[in-house]
Amino acid sequence: MLFQNKYMAITVNDINNGVMIQITGEVDLSISPDIKDKILEQIDFNKKEHNFSISKSIYADLSEVSYIDSSGIASLIQSHQQAAKSGVNFYLFKTSPGVLKVIKLARLDSIFKLV
């Protein structure tokens, strides 16, 4: 467990082809910067460890996110952009119905890789 408060938690686990960042709870302005920081840390780690030669994937597991606001969406967009610049695949994994609805309303489902 990397970060936890009474409303949410962030965990990071290595998987075969990359890293799974599981986000649980509510994602709002109070926590969005922490989420972005954890994702960017993994992007930077991937760059340093693999010297740009092997690109691992980062999966943001949003299956247990009960709420997301515009700051949370902005953090995901910034993470997606930084991953693309770094040659790292960034996926939104198992988005919860509420999060998926927000992503589709904002027409971001054509930008994010949803798995």
Where are the model-predicted features located?
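Non-catalytic signal-transmission and effector/linker regions of two-component phosphorelay proteins
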Residues: M1-D14
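Short acidic-hydrophobic, aromatic-tinged amphipathic segments that line or gate anion-handling sites
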Residues: K113-V115
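Amphipathic alpha-helical interaction surfaces in cytosolic regulatory modules
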Residues: L29-I111
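STAS-typified acidic loop motif
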Residues: T11-L40
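Intrinsically disordered, low-complexity regions enriched for glutamine and histidine
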Residues: L2-N5, M20, Q78
